[in-house]
Amino acid sequence: VGADLLAGSLIKNPGGGLAKIGGYIAGRADLVEKCAYRMTAPGIGAEAGASLNTLADFYQGFFMAPHTVSQSLKGAIFTAAMLEAVGMTTSPHYTDQRTDLIQSVSFQTAEQMVAFCREIQAASPINAHFAPEPAYMPGYEDDVIMAAGTFVQGSSIELTADGPIRPPYTAFVQGGLTYEH
């Protein structure tokens, strides 16, 4: 198993919930160098990079990421156990080995799914007073609902829930900077 080149977002797990922008590229040195020249300019490559007071967030995010990810995993396990205890279907099961932070939760109706996502939003530290509505999103055949009252826009390491409004009605719960949340 391996890859010649990979790329990712720092507003996800590696940023520890602190990086507000940024990404990373890793892999074979020759390919990383080509990416660096494509992202900047020939002759500049990786010699220039992040600035404007972003480096502290990146470094602190990398430092905090292992703890933040462990908190999020604990939250996903707790979510699965709690919802299964009241008869809901989740995947993975709370005792399953995990390879991701995403916890899927299945509902009988679209209304139940929307209500669940609204409760996630209501428990969020940012924009808790908003009620998410299913809406069209490019790339999806069906309307999508997204609950994400996050400090960093697009950050799925923070507590979020989203999914397309179609059978099987499944919301994908992600993140949680802290287990307590």
PLM-predicted stretches and their roles:
Residues 8-113:
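Active-site C-terminal subdomain of aminotransferase-like
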Residues 4:
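Receiver (REC) domain switch/active-site residues of two-component response regulators
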Residues 1:
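Catalytic PLP-binding core of fold-type I/II PLP enzymes
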Residues 84-181:
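Conserved C-terminal alpha-helix-loop-beta "cap" of PLP-dependent enzymes
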